[in-house]
Amino acid sequence: MAEAHSALWGLVEEFVVGEQDSRSAEVAAGVKDGIFTVLQVVEALGSCLANPEPRSRAKGMQLLSRVLLECYSRLTEKEVEVLVLFYENRLKDHHLITPHVLKGLMALSMCDVLPQGLAVSVLKSVFQEVHVQSLMQIDRHTVYMIITNFMKTREEELKSLGADFTYGFIQVMDGEKDPRNLLVAFHIVQDIITKNYALGPFVEELFEVTSCYFPIDFTPPPNDPHGITREHLIVGLRAVLVSTSRFAEFFLPLLIEKMDSDVQSAKLDSLQTLIACCTVYGQKDLKEFLSGLWSSIRREVFQTASEKIEAEGLAALQALSACLSRSILSPDAEDLLDSFLNSILQDCKHHLCEPDMKLVWPSAKLLQAAAGGSSRACWKVTANVLPLLLEQYNQHAQSSHRRTILEMTLGFLKLQSRWLDEEDDNGLGNLKEALCTMVFSAVTDSSTQLHQVAVRTLTVLAMQQGFLSSSDIDLVVDHLTRLILQETDSESCMAAIEASGTLAKVHPSVFISRMLPQLCANLQTEPMDINLNESRVVPERFIRQRCLEALAAVSTHQSILKETVPILLDYIGRVHNGEGETNAENVVSICRSLHRVAVQCQLDSEALQFYHEIVLPSLLSLTVQAATQDSGTSCNVLLRDDVLTAMVPVITAACTHLTPELASKSVSQVVALFLDGDVSLFSENNLPSNFQPFQVNGPTELQNHLVSLLMAFVCSLPRNVEIPHLRRLLQHLLSLSLSGCSPFAYSSASKCFAGLINKCPQGDLLDDILQVTAQRIDVGLVDEPSRTRAITLLVWVTKALVLRYHPLSGQLTNKMIGLLSDKQLGPSVANMFSLLVSDSPDIINKACHADIRIMFRQRFFTENVPKLVQGFNSANRDDKPNYLKALSHVLNALPKQVLMPELPSLLSLLLEALSCPDKVVQLSTLTCLEPLLQEAPETLKVHIDGLISKLVSLTLSPAMAVRITALKCILALTKLPLHMLLPYKQQVIRALAKPLDDKKRLVRKEAVETRCQWFLLGSPGS
């Protein structure tokens, strides 16, 4: 015991006299280990704490407070009581001691065993004895933390202080300037208000002590380690200012003043804060200031050049309208919403009638914003404005004016449909005839711009149940059909197709009876003689394409789906039978339409089941028949690579959302078809039984191509769906992948094999298959004729395993890295690294339920980039571009935050990649560099000379994409510190003169912006 006592005294003396700061940690460790107690530490510090020299006393308090910060959770209630009284007394000591006393009090404020009443005692002492704003920032922060800790754990005690607590905190905060402390202080004020601490007579004082920071004007210093932004402070202060309506009488005049200032950021902050206020303030709070608020908002919308400020002004007006709409009116109370809307109508309505229409749009936007606040506001504004707009439409003959008026009408109708659903309540009943006359005349006008607005307006009117009569709906659909089939303007046609898709959900029977027959008739029309066809306004091929798009668009209701899907499949059947045009491009277009229909069905299980049960058998039946018939017939169109590629997403989309029962039933039939030629999936009885898609060479060569459809099916099923005969299927796919079939067939087989491997459960089957696969790939890489097939299989299997973190993925990736030095395969292997880290569009992706682990790219980067760098350094000159290309593909797929820490070690390699003659390497490297350039000035400092030289030379590259991206990189450099760029300013400006005359407009556009920014470097205000 005596030995421990002696050791403690020794440690204390070494800390206080010997200035050995590390001794405080040893003392704290002794307390934690129970070697001595905190009170023994106080006793050991006795002579030091009683020393007449303030610095010695400060040193003693520093040691004690450090120990308390480490050991506060071990203190007993009695120890805490003694220490609190001691520390409160120390607050009266010399100012040098105060910071250390506050640290100790912060430690004590975190003690769970703090006796009742001591929190109040501590805060009273702090408020009375400490002039907080004369302290250093860190010590002021300590005071805020003491208050925060007590507010979390001793709320009721603090509330017993009443308004004295609020007044004490006001004194603490008054004059605070440091953003770190302000964030904490704002949070404390918000808690004082929201947790109902007594404000007493100090409401205005509390407002003043916080509102003096509004609006926030803060720019964080470069490389600020604290990471505090202006936005953090804005959000913190805004939460305070809008936390109580008791601030309204003080804050709203300030808001109006700041909205009228010339500082754009102040306007923006004020408008956004007003929006937040409207969720808390009530009618009585706003009443006195409505006129001033409206004047300020109106001025901003009428006069501002900033779209952002205009948008926030309109949002603020809508928030005011919503706020005034929420209050419940007593019979004798003034309706503030009504009077407020009257003011807006009075100031804006007459602008809608001005002949020059200069202020039409600002006025319409203001009126629509006010109407957007509530159903009551919407009813009043639209009842006043819509008759006026209808009148103006008839008075203006110019299409441009009519379009403007119709667009405004559309805006108000959208508000009507949002707030006022029922016909009896929406106020449009007496305007129905005039509205229909206006819109139907617009949709037949000669102006295509007017057509587009009219179509959108018709859509809004027809979506309101019961508003239009059945004959009106028929007329709407007829107009849409006419625009689709006859309109020369493609945008008007697309607007009609989009509107048809929207309205078909609500009026399916009308579309079935009126639009579908015309679409079907035009789709099946035979191509006419070219001389007879010249009189057609819209070429035949465009009409066919439009019909296909429209059929897909309207397939949003199950009853329509049952009509459109057979029409589309029938067209493919006619191609198969050699009827009409046997055009692969048309079949591809139909497949795109079928794909869109499938995507639209995915959230409707009944529609998806119907689609799946009719489309999958039909496509497989037609293609199997085509593959098993004599070659040379027209049906071979269905076996073309581009047609089968277009069918893949159709089947994929039809299978990704299947129910487990339907998926299991289908997979057994499809696998039986491909493995055994079992045609029971098809309803036809005349199908041949000689379907052998895994047999290589001979008459079945075309059948190999259909493995792409098998891939689309089995690789898109959920992982919990069991694939029957999986081992046998994988063996066949593996053999086909390495056989002498066509590139399309062996690529499809490799992808299908990889997709199944990715989802295959861990176990003997997976281990056996992978072992055999690795061996056969090795053999294939040695055999000259099969090397390309082997590398295709290798990259897909590697991708499948990389995504699921399989142990074998590292071995296969190493094999690919080694092949970068292969003279024959090196360039193609380098390109395949892009496939390893990018998202695959057709298989092994999230939509197809692939096994994809989080952050697989980061893991791939960490494990393999060092190997690529090492391989580059040891490779001969001819092989180095392969390593650079592989590296640039990997880096380009990574998020910026992952790349930044690695940039110093990789930058020299990236610069070397810019000198590589391969355009793919150049573009990939530039794309990777662009977002990083402005983030690492210290790293770039060493390389800036070479970087600028290489980027400037690439602005003259033969490849347009390289020229544009190089210019974007040079533009990104302007964000670097000025001192780094000024020595190169004139060099870059001279070099950028050539891209200004580039033959491509996009390059010239980028060059102009880049050169302007370099011109401005170093100029005032830049």
UniProtKB/Swiss-Prot annotation:
- Report the Gene3D superfamilies cross-referenced here: Leucine-rich Repeat Variant
Q: Which UniProt keywords apply?
A: Cytoplasm, Cytoskeleton, DNA damage, DNA repair, Nucleus, Repeat
Q: Which InterPro entries match?
A: ARM-like, ARM-type_fold, MMS19, MMS19_C, MMS19_N
List this protein's GO terms for biological process.
Answer: DNA repair; protein maturation
Localization in the cell: Nucleus; Cytoplasm, Cytoskeleton, Spindle
Gene Ontology CC terms: cytoplasm; cytosolic [4Fe-4S] assembly targeting complex; nucleus; spindle
Q: Which family does the UniProt entry place this protein in?
A: Belongs to the MET18/MMS19 family.
What is the annotated quaternary arrangement, including any partners? Answer: Component of the CIA complex.
Q: What does this chain do?
A: Key component of the cytosolic iron-sulfur protein assembly (CIA) complex, a multiprotein complex that mediates the incorporation of iron-sulfur cluster into apoproteins specifically involved in DNA metabolism and genomic integrity. In the CIA complex, MMS19 acts as an adapter between early-acting CIA components and a subset of cellular target iron-sulfur proteins.
Q: What is this protein called?
A: MMS19 nucleotide excision repair protein homolog
Q: To which species is this protein native?
A: Xenopus tropicalis
